[in-house]
């Protein structure tokens, strides 16, 4: 081991920093470039502030929004026979009276 100058801060010791500058490349060599690159690129850990995603509140006047109005559809009609349902209720009522 080479003797280290005690007056130097630990982060300024020779060999403590890589010879090349960190870059934005995510290749394997650049991910293992230094401890900072490894945590940021290799592990994906970032301790900075999270950026807020900006939302557009109002659409421009000329643009068409995605929520088009639904065309009006006629109300669905009941498929059963209304007269038949009235007769069946009368038959049930007459049967219950006869049973009593």
Swiss-Prot record:
Family the UniProt entry places it in: Belongs to the lentiviruses Tat family.
PTM comment: Asymmetrical arginine methylation by host PRMT6 seems to diminish the transactivation capacity of Tat and affects the interaction with host CCNT1. Acetylation by EP300, CREBBP, GCN5L2/GCN5 and PCAF regulates the transactivation activity of Tat. EP300-mediated acetylation of Lys-50 promotes dissociation of Tat from the TAR RNA through the competitive binding to PCAF's bromodomain. In addition, the non-acetylated Tat's N-terminus can also interact with PCAF. PCAF-mediated acetylation of Lys-28 enhances Tat's binding to CCNT1. Lys-50 is deacetylated by SIRT1.
Region of interest called Interaction with human CREBBP, as start-end residue ranges on this chain: 1-24
Major subcellular location class: host cell
Biased composition (Basic residues): 48-58
Gene Ontology molecular functions: actinin binding; cyclin binding; metal ion binding; protein domain specific binding; protein serine/threonine phosphatase inhibitor activity; RNA-binding transcription regulator activity; trans-activation response element binding
Protein name in UniProt: Protein Tat
UniProt site positions, description: Essential for Tat translocation through the endosomal membrane: 11
Chain spans, region Interaction with the host capping enzyme RNGTT: 49-87
Native source species: Simian immunodeficiency virus (isolate CPZ GAB1)
Modified residues (N6-acetyllysine): 28, 50-51
Record region (Transactivation): 1-48
GO CC, one annotated term: extracellular region
Residues annotated for Zn(2+) 1 binding in this entry: 22, 33-34, 37
Renumbered ranges of motif Nuclear localization signal, RNA-binding (TAR), and protein transduction: 49-57
């Amino acid at each position: 081991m080479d003797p280290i100058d005690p007056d130097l801060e630990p982060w300024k010791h020779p060999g403590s920093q890589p010879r090349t500058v960190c870059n934005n490349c995510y290749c394997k060599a650049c991910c293992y470039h230094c401890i900072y690159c490894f945590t940021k690129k290799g592990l994906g850990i970032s301790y900075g502030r999270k950026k807020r995603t900006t939302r557009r509140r109002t659409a421009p006047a000329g643009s068409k929004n995605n929520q088009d109005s639904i065309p009006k559809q006629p109300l669905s009609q009941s498929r059963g026979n209304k007269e038949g349902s009235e007769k069946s209720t009368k038959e049930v009522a007459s049967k219950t009276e006869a049973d009593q």
